[in-house]
Regions:
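Short, charged low-complexity linear segments at domain edges
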Residues: 380-410
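Short helix-to-turn junction characteristic of helix-turn-helix DNA-binding domains
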Residues: 48, 243, 294, 396, ...
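Helicase motor core with emphasis on the C-terminal RecA-like subdomain
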Residues: 7, 14-31, 35, 39, ...
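Flexible coil/turn residues that form the inter-helical turn or adjacent wing/linker of helix-turn-helix
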Residues: 185, 247, 399, 449, ...
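Accessory DNA-binding and partner-docking regions appended to nucleic-acid-acting proteins
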Residues: 8-24, 358-359, 370-375, 384-386, ...
Length: 625
């Protein structure tokens, strides 16, 4: 075994390890087939190569893995990647091996014999990159081997899991600094996450004990994603319509409960769609089998709870539909971000109903207590979860640009209108709602600030509901004063007043409307209010589609996909690990004739060119004659 001298692997002098003769761009091209770095990747790579810790906050699909994989191939030593995601480890290791990189993973999916084999190979220095589940880091056998190895870097994926205020807190992440401290010398550390508020970012830096880290935020925008919120009367009918419009496309349908997953999956299967399911109630073998069916394109649609998808690197997901509203914006954006990872246009559609809010309130209030938190801390977590749910609800009811709402939530800036969301493409007009707001606020005040949205709407619209009448609410002066106002419009105005601080909705399961101090100016006529309200005729909100290929190239693309599928099946790997759809489309456009031209295709590296070039060039040649 090779024992690196202390002077070489010392943290302060870690840059000595860098193979400076190898240009990072040549590594990027040779192994990953890319000619240039994306936004942020260059700075992060330079920082890690120079021995400075990094906190990288980059949206899903922005190429976080490149940020540590390129330096890993330039360091003399080994890189340890900490990841909580078994499926992602498997896919990324497969992709690295396909690209000519010696890599392995250690997690609970390995048999004891496989685990011992990986340890043996690790000890003999056979791997350049090792993915490890956080629970396995401090295992005596693994830690004992690592103490004697030249470990150049530790990369922490899904770093928000270290924070108890994050949406995926995992106590095992708190052990990562102990693992690093137990090594003979401190490696450079990179922490990466797709979604992190300011509080979570501070936690990551503190709890992972990052040393003067370079913080790189590339922006949260995913320009190729089209965001849409719908409030259908019948979700199942609307879902079938959406799926039929996307026939043969790969997509994910997220549901909030196991029961909903079963019902939606059965609905899709009965209507002839190749759908499968994933939730925590299934045994591990079935979950793995169903996940593989989706990853290997045997099933085109995955219906799942949020237990699925955080570690799925499937590049050709063209739509994500949320059948139910998630609990918070962090979860929503991460799950929606599974779409369009290949850079092609994709749809992110949320089907909203008020029932979703109540379901999530129930889940928050009845969540399993965390034994690592005190009761006061647990209550604070619930309070923050309720606040995040409120923001998620505002997203579903807002009339402003959905992309702008998302970006502002994460502290980023966006245009007033993106023209690539359902709100921007819907037919709304800027409407004076001052009088309507006064009527609503007056009703809330005159009924004693004791009722929720439904009752207030019923009073204002003059409902003949017996319970309302028996409660004496029909005798209120505000009873029926908005009888001509459609219920949806009335609810939209109430949501707008709550979202902008003129009223509050207090309580969890059945929120009560109350006036906020800000309402005084409106009630006294000193302030006017306007909002974007939908007018009857509405443009169809449809995502921008990728420019179509010529008919001849469409046939070539189909042939290339068939070849890719055949090659993938022979190796028992997902098709997108061979080449992504975006790479196949680039082949159709460039139509390379030689190995030299083939390697110029985006996404084709040296190893893949040698492994697959002759097969793909032969098919391209057939269509070029």
């Amino acid at each position: 075994m090779f024992f690196a001298p202390q002077s070489i692997i010392n943290f302060i002098n870690i840059s000595v390890e860098v193979q400076t003769v190898r240009d990072k761009l040549s590594v990027l091209k040779e192994y990953f087939g890319h000619d240039s770095f994306r936004e942020g990747q260059d700075r992060i790579t330079d920082s890690l190569l120079g021995g400075r810790d990094v906190l990288g906050i980059m949206p899903t699909g922005a190429g976080k893995s490149i940020c540590y994989q390129v330096p890993a191939l330039m360091f003399d030593g080994i890189t340890i990647v900490v990841s909580p995601l078994i499926s992602l480890m498997k896919d990324q290791v497969s992709a690295l091996v396909q690209s000519g990189v010696a890599a392995a993973y250690i997690n609970s999916s390995l048999t004891h014999a496989q685990y011992l084999k990986v340890l043996q190979n690790t000890e003999s220095g056979k791997y350049k990159i090792i993915y490890v589940a956080p629970e396995r880091l401090c295992a005596p056998a693994f830690l004992g081997i690592c103490r004697n190895l030249n470990i150049s870097m530790v990369a922490v994926d899904e770093a928000h899991c270290v924070s108890q205020w994050g949406q995926d807190f995992r106590p095992s992440y708190l052990k990562i600094p102990d693992f690093i401290d137990a090594l003979n010398s401190r490696p450079v550390v990179g922490a990466f996450t797709a979604t992190a508020t300011g509080a979570v970012r501070d936690d990551i830096k503190t709890l992972l004990r990052l040393v003067s880290p370079l913080v790189v935020t590339t922006g949260f925008d995913r320009p190729n994603l089209f965001f849409s919120v719908m409030q259908p009367k019948n979700k199942s009918i609307e879902l079938m319509k959406l799926i039929k419009e996307r026939k043969n496309e790969s997509g994910i349908v997220y549901c909030s409960t196991r029961k909903a997953v079963e019902e939606v999956c059965e609905l899709l299967q009965k209507n002839g769609f190749a759908a499968t399911r994933y939730h925590a109630g299934l045994d591990e073998n079935e979950r793995r089998r169903n996940q593989d069916d989706f990853v290997y394109d045997r099933a085109t649609i995955m219906v799942a709870t949020n237990a699925f998808g955080m570690g799925i690197d499937k590049s050709n997901v063209s739509f994500v539909i949320h059948y139910n509203m998630p609990k918070n914006m962090e979860s929503y954006y991460q799950e929606a971000g599974r779409a369009g990872r290949d850079g092609r246009n994709a749809d992110c559609i949320l089907l909203y109903s008020a029932k979703d809010v109540r379901t999530n309130q129930f889940l928050i209030n009845n969540s399993e207590p965390n034994p690592d938190l005190t009761e006061d801390e647990q209550e604070e977590v619930r309070r923050r979860d309720r606040e995040r749910l409120k923001q998620m609800t505002f997203y579903c009811t807002t009339h402003k640009c959905l992309r702008k709402f998302i970006l502002e939530y994460f502290g980023d800036k966006g245009p007033e209108r993106c023209e690539k969301c359902s709100n921007c493409l819907s037919n709304h007009e800027n409407t004076d709602i001052t009088v309507d707001a006064q009527k609503i606020m007056s009703c809330v005040a005159r009924t004693g600030q004791r009722y929720g949205k439904k009752v207030i709407c019923d009073v204002l619209r003059g409902s003949k509901n017996e319970r309302l009448i028996s409660a004496g609410l029909s005798r209120q002066s505000t009873y029926g004063i908005m009888a001509d106002c459609p219920e949806k419009r009335l609810r939209d105005i109430i949501d707008h007043l709550c979202e902008n601080g003129y009223m509050t909705a207090q309580g969890d399961e059945y929120p009560i409307l109350k006036l906020a101090p800000k309402s005084r100016g409106v009630l006294t006529g000193q302030e006017t209010l306007r909002m974007m309200l939908e007018i009857p005729q509405k443009k169809k909100a449809a995502a921008a589609k990728d420019a179509p290929l010529p008919p001849a190239d469409e046939k070539l693309l189909a042939a290339l996909k068939d070849l890719r599928k055949s090659l993938a099946m022979r190796q028992s790997i997902p098709a997108y690990v061979v080449f992504t759809d975006a790479t196949l489309i680039d082949m159709c456009r460039l139509k390379p004739k030689t190995q030299e031209e083939f390697i110029e295709v985006s996404g084709v590296g040296q190893a893949k060119s040698q492994r697959y070039g002759e097969f793909f060039l032969a098919v391209i040649a057939e269509f070029s004659e």
